[in-house]
Amino acid sequence: MSETSSSRPPRDLSQLRTELASKDTEIVKLLADRMRLIRDVAEYKAEKGLPSFDREREGELLDVLLQRAHDRGLPGDVVRDVFTALFEASRLDQRRFLQTRADKYKIGIIGGTAGMGAFMANVFRQSGFEVEAMGLDFGRSAEEVAASNEIVILSVPIASTVEVARRVGPKLRPGACLMDITSIKRAPLAAMIESTSEEVEVVGTHPMFGPHGIDFDRQKVVLCRGRGDLWYARIKKLYEAFGAEVVEATAEEHDLQMAVIQVLVHEKTMVLGSVLERLKADLARSLQFASPIYRTELAMIGRMFSQHAELYADILTANDDATRLSSLFEQEAGHFARAVAMHDRAAVVKRFQQVAEYMKEFASWARKQSDAILVELVRRG
């Protein structure tokens, strides 16, 4: 009969600690070997012009590792945390290497003293780029900045972008690049192209994130072609060197997607916040009852209403595709409101099932993503 763990005599604690220390040392050696391989990967990517971040590969690798952990009886959350930290360290090492190899351009940021413009100025400066930022009460004039830099970035409110582009566009020198970081693309791109000479290239960009973090790690940036190919390729490579995942699109597709991604989502959040305000709901008390989903939703509502009203007003009103989608939103909200008012359970079930059928191929990914978000929220309290 085999000896069970309960009947086995206890081992000496100092011996156990010695063995643990030995295993920890082995782990450190493995980590050092892994980081050396990461540097080799970075050198290869620099030579081939590849981005530092590959979302699909990273996700597939983590799934494989989690399955192997499960097969060995290891807790998935611990393994996920360990490899998430390792992947983050690996990406940072790759980005730093790629940034040292990147061509250093003179960058002028119009509107570079606050918000996203200030964030980008800081990111580029820390990697050795010469950056000139100007704001309403700081620095040289926008025209002077435009005339003396290789890359000129427009980081101004949506409502001002077209006017600023028309004002500074004629000042750019031949061979330079004018780009924006606005959340609509058709009107800004048209204004940048119309206001600049044929010798100036134009690129439309839209970082799909806010001014936080140390750079663009794992963040998406949409690129839209304006005029020319040279600077388009350079800007794409530059974003990728700082860890961004670049999505290429036409200005028309970008604006239609933003009507869904930004207008619909932000309008929904505004409506929810407005309802809570009309109810004068006790938010602190509601959190004592809250499910993780409600806590997430309330956090997003609070986040939006802690920012500038003008930004969201511009997002909702400047996109030419917004009116049609907002009308559809109103129709669907009205459909459910009528069903609730009439206690029409069948109508709710019918529409729910129609949407579920539309989303069935998307459901597996959605459950996986939302589960990860909710688990992390519960862990963090």
Language-model features: where?
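Hydrophobic/small residue at the entry helix of a nucleotide-binding pocket
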Residues: 115-116
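Active-site-proximal catalytic alpha-helix in oxidoreductases
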Residues: 219, 254-283, 287-306
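Extended, charge-rich alpha-helical interface modules
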Residues: 2-105, 122, 126
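Adenosine-cofactor binding site in Rossmann-like domains, unifying the SAM/SAH pocket
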Residues: 131-144
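Interdomain hinge/lid region at the active-site interface
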Residues: 287-362
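Rossmann-fold NAD(P) dinucleotide-binding segment
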Residues: 143-195
